[in-house]
């Protein structure tokens, strides 16, 4: 994670996140490093479909058509977070933590 902060510093960038499957782990990890507030603007934990729609403004049609465990949803999560928090970079995490398949998709992550 320190390498990420070095790169953010080099380009004078700020980062944000939108987390579902990781439930705040990325934000916790990046903010555990001293000085992270210079680079990290904040993030959203959107564990439910409702929070994705209401907080990060994911289109309901995206969820209905592709599901929350999809590249399309992950991209929309990142782009909307970037716009809301006005950062250079936003990262999103969605996926299926298991133990069973969700949306007919295996356990795993989509970034």
Model-flagged regions — what are they?
Residues 1-111:
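Short alpha-helical segments enriched in small residues
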């Amino acid at each position: 994670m320190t390498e990420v902060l070095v790169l953010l510093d080099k380009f004078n960038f700020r980062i944000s996140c939108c987390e579902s499957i990781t439930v705040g782990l990325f934000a916790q990890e990046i903010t555990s490093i001293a000085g992270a507030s210079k680079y990290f603007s904040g993030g959203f934990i959107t564990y439910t479909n409702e929070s994705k729609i209401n907080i990060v403004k994911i289109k309901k049609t995206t969820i209905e058509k592709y599901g929350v465990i999809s590249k399309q949803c992950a991209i929309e999560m990142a782009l909307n977070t970037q716009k809301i928090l006005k950062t250079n970079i936003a990262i999103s995490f969605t996926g299926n933590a298991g133990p069973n398949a969700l949306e007919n998709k295996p356990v795993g992550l989509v970034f």
